[in-house]
Structure formats: structure tokens, C-alpha cells
């Protein structure tokens, strides 16, 4: 809807506040031909970005961060209304966004090749942009996850076409207005950055298939990620997909700390986080104590209006999502799960649920993407690792123990992209490598690592000069 410096305004898709269920915006849905045109414009402007000096790319990113910092409250409120995320969590997302843009700016100046010794001449390498990056982003972090794609893309001199989730596109629209302002201020053609709103099965599909796209960076579900990977053919692809992220609690750990961490992490953004705790595997000697702490902590959570600073858990993104979670809870109980607390639904709200299950229960195998915390009893760390690895996912895992030798042995044994010791799987910093194995994805995010993904290495050899 922002193509070649022009806004295309139509009332094609309704956007709803998931808490009030009121219509808050109408956005444009590009059709396939419009999407192809947007990609073509992005491709025509790739040389503009490539030829910008590192200092100019740095300035673009720092100016974007500066403008966001002046509108922090607006962005936080927008995220809370658009997604249903509690305002205190939305403010953290805005702060992380600023960090990610500033880190991207730093790496714009740090991009460099190397010199290789040779007796036959001079060998050196250059880092060059890929060309056109297609960024496809989800609803749950509608500002920060965009930044993790477009920040490194700009830093490395790529032109960008962004396709945000149509469920929560407003933060992306506000961000695009800032980018428009910065590009105009710096006298850079606006066609280097294009915003393509609409339905994923049209816009996202075309971005993944189109030959003018050099790289697709996607965050979302496994099913769509697999489709993008298939469509992309020889394109470079990074996929940050789902997970059922285990948290192992051993009897020698700080049980109360582990329980607090599990509750805080599981119910962040109503469980709509790809690295949310998927299941807690607890040694049987401390299961009763751990479960008591979990229930006590869960009872203290405040459910309600995302704009209230006291709220800990807001709604899911839609009533349909909440109904899906309600049905998953019922199915889990039918399979023998014991519901200890919560699980009731009111429109898009789900009261945080805690369920005792075994490893054959469906909640041990899937990504719930909702406020449901499954607890499993295990005999020892070996059984915990075995259950954790018996999964198609491999995003992040957490281990609580006071024995560093056990911790390192378990970290070596777990088949996951990231292992958090004495922290939940939900831990993430914007400058650390982030990504999964197995069905949880391809490639790594984290600004430095995304910068590496968005470059090509060119080798130059000089003889006899």
C-alpha cells in the first residue's frame, strides 16, 4: 500500500481490536498484479541501495530510530490495541525495536571482507547486498520482528518489500511513514522500501515465488514456512518458525525461581510467542512443590484490558484463536490431562491454564500458541532430554539446575537452536543468534547474524599489476 513513494488507500480488509472486537482500521489488500508491480519497483531500486555508502545506510537507520523514540508511547499503544498485548509488554517491544535499529546501524559500518595471503597475487573479499529482500512478518511482535528483517536489509544495501500480517498491520504502517519521511529528508528514492499489505495467500505467495526477489525472510508457522521454502526454489531463505519449547526443571534447582520463570514466560503475550514455554519437564521429587508454586503464581496474574498498566495477560489475536485454544484444552483433558487451573474463555480472552499431562498427550507434541502451560513428570534428566528431543521442533529449550556439569551435558544433548541455563526458553536478546533446527526453521536472526545472511561474499584476485 506504500509503493514507489505513493500510498494506495482502499478499504479492503477490516482490522479489529482483539479486546473490544471493534473495527479500528481498514487497509488495502494488494492483488497479485499490484504485488508484482511492487516487487518490480523494489527491484528497479536495488542499485540505489547498493550504491549508498555505509555512512548513509547508518544515517538512515539512526534517523528511523530517532523518529521512533519520539513516538514511543504512540507505538506502544498501537501495538496494544492492534495485537492485544499488555501495554507494559508493548513498551518493551518498542525499546527492543530501538535497540535493533541501532544495532543494524552499527553493523552497516562494520560490514567488511578480508584479505587472504597468497604468493601468487592479492586475494581479498567484498561483502555485497543480495539485491531485493522480501520480509514477511507475523502479528505477535508487529514492530520488533519487522526491524529484525528490514534493519539488516538496509544495513547491507538491499532494497526491501515488506509484507506484514493483515491481522496487525498498523504498527508497520506507522513505521513506513517514518521511513518515508527519512528517505525524503535524505533525498533517497522512496522505491527502495515498499509496503505490501494484503492477504498472505496472494501477497506473501507472490513474494516467495517471484524471480525478482533474491531473499525471503519469514517468521510464522511451520506450514507456511514449508510452502515458502518450496516456492522459493533457488532463493536464499531464512525461516523462523514454531516450536514446542521444553523447560527442564531438575530437583537440585531453585524451584521457586523456575516456577516464576515458567509462568512469566508462558503467559507473555497470552502465549503467542514462538519461544514460549511449550512444556515443563519436572523431576518427580519436586513436582508437587513446583506445581504449587506454578498455581500460586498463575492465580496472581491479572487478565483484562491491554491498555491497563496492571494487566498481565490480554486477549488472543481473535475469538477464533481463543476458541482453538479452548478446544485444545478440552481435547487434552479427554486424552487424560488434568486441568489444574484456568481454561475458561470470554470472547478472545482465555484464563491462563495449567495442565498435568504425559508425553503421549497432544500438548506435548504441538505448538499451542496460547496461554496453556503443560507440566510433565519425569524420573531424571535423561528421560527429560529424551522427551524433549522426541519432537519435530527444535527452537529453544530451558534447563534449571545448580549443577554446571549437568547443565552442560544436557545442553550438548538437546537438539535445539538455543539452550537457556537457569532461564526459560523465552529468553532472547536482539544481538544473539536466534533460530531453530528441524521443523523450527532455517538460518539465524539476531542483527549481526541476519546481516551475514543478507550478504554475498565476492572474491577478487589480482595478478601481475
From Swiss-Prot:
Which positions are annotated as binding NAD(+)? 220-225
Q: Does the keyword GTP-binding apply?
A: no
Q: Which reaction does it catalyse?
A: (S)-lactaldehyde + NAD(+) + H2O = (S)-lactate + NADH + 2 H(+)
In its keyword annotation, does this UniProt entry include Lyase? Answer: no
Supply the EC number(s).
1.2.1.22
Q: Which UniProt keywords apply?
A: NAD, Oxidoreductase
Look up the record and name the pathway of this protein: Cofactor biosynthesis; coenzyme F420 biosynthesis
Record InterPro entries = Ald_DH/histidinol_DH (IPR016161), Ald_DH_C (IPR016163), Ald_DH_CS_GLU (IPR029510), Ald_DH_N (IPR016162), Aldehyde_DH_dom (IPR015590), ALDH-related_metabolic_enz (IPR051020), Lactaldehyde_DH (IPR053404)
What does the function comment of this entry state? Answer: Involved in F420 biosynthesis through the oxidation of lactaldehyde to lactate.
Q: How does it assemble?
A: Homotetramer.
Family membership: Belongs to the aldehyde dehydrogenase family.
The name this protein goes by in its record: Lactaldehyde dehydrogenase
- The scientific name of the source species is Methanococcus maripaludis (strain C7 / ATCC BAA-1331)
Q: What is the lineage of its organism?
A: Archaea, Methanobacteriati, Methanobacteriota, Methanomada group, Methanococci
Amino acid at each position: 500500500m506504500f509503493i514507489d513513494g505513493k500510498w494506495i488507500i482502499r478499504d479492503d480488509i477490516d482490522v479489529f481490536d482483539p479486546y473490544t472486537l471493534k473495527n479500528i482500521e481498514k487497509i488495502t489488500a494488494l492483488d497479485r498484479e499490484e504485488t508484482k508491480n511492487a516487487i518490480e519497483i523494489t527491484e528497479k531500486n536495488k542499485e540505489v541501495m547498493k550504491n549508498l555508502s555505509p555512512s548513509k545506510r547508518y544515517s538512515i537507520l539512526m534517523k528511523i530510530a530517532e523518529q521512533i523514540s519520539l513516538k514511543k508511547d504512540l507505538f506502544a499503544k498501537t501495538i496494544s490495541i492492534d495485537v492485544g498485548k499488555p501495554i507494559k509488554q508493548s513498551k518493551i517491544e518498542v525499546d527492543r525495536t530501538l535497540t535493533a535499529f541501532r544495532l543494524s546501524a552499527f553493523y552497516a559500518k562494520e560490514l567488511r571482507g578480508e584479505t587472504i595471503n597468497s604468493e601468487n597475487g592479492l586475494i581479498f573479499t567484498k561483502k555485497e547486498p543480495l539485491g531485493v529482500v522480501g520480509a514477511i512478518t507475523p502479528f505477535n511482535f508487529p514492530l520488533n520482528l519487522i526491524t529484525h528483517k528490514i534493519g539488516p536489509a538496509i544495513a547491507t544495501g538491499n532494497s526491501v518489500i515488506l509484507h506484514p500480517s493483515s491481522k496487525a498491520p498498523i504498527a508497520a504502517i506507522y513505521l513506513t511513514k517514518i521511513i518515508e519521511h527519512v528517505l525524503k529528508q535524505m533525498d533517497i528514492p522512496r522505491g527502495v522500501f515498499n509496503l505490501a499489505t494484503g492477504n498472505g495467500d496472494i501477497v506473501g505467495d507472490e513474494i516467495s515465488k517471484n524471480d525478482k526477489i533474491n531473499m525471503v525472510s519469514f517468521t510464522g508457522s511451520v506450514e507456511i514456512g514449508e510452502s515458502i521454502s518450496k516456492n522459493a526454489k533457488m532463493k536464499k531463505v531464512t525461516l523462523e518458525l514454531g516450536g514446542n519449547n521444553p523447560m527442564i526443571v531438575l530437583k537440585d534447582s531453585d524451584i521457586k525461581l523456575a516456577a516464576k520463570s515458567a509462568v512469566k514466560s508462558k503467559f507473555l503475550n497470552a502465549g503467542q510467542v514462538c519461544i514460549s514455554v511449550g512444556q515443563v519437564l519436572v523431576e518427580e521429587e519436586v513436582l508437587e512443590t513446583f506445581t504449587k508454586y506454578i498455581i500460586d503464581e498463575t492465580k496472581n496474574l491479572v487478565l483484562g484490558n491491554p491498555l491497563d498498566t496492571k494487566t498481565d495477560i490480554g486477549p488472543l489475536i481473535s475469538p477464533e484463536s481463543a476458541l482453538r485454544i479452548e478446544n485444545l484444552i478440552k481435547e487434552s483433558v479427554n486424552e487424560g490431562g488434568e486441568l489444574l487451573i484456568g481454561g475458561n474463555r470470554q470472547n478472545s480472552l482465555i484464563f491462563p491454564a495449567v495442565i498435568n499431562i504425559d508425553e503421549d498427550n497432544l500438548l506435548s507434541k504441538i505448538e499451542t500458541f496460547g496461554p496453556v502451560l503443560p507440566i510433565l513428570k519425569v524420573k531424571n534428566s535423561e528421560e527429560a532430554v529424551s522427551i524433549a528431543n522426541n519432537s519435530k521442533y527444535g527452537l529453544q529449550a530451558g534447563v534449571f539446575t545448580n549443577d554446571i556439569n549437568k547443565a552442560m551435558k544436557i545442553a550438548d544433548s538437546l537438539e535445539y537452536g538455543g539452550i537457556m541455563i537457569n532461564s526459560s526458553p523465552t529468553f532472547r536478546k536482539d544481538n544473539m543468534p536466534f533460530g531453530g533446527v528441524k521443523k523450527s526453521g532455517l538460518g539465524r536472526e539476531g542483527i549481526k547474524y541476519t546481516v551475514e545472511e543478507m550478504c554475498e561474499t565476492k572474491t577478487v584476485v589480482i595478478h601481475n599489476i
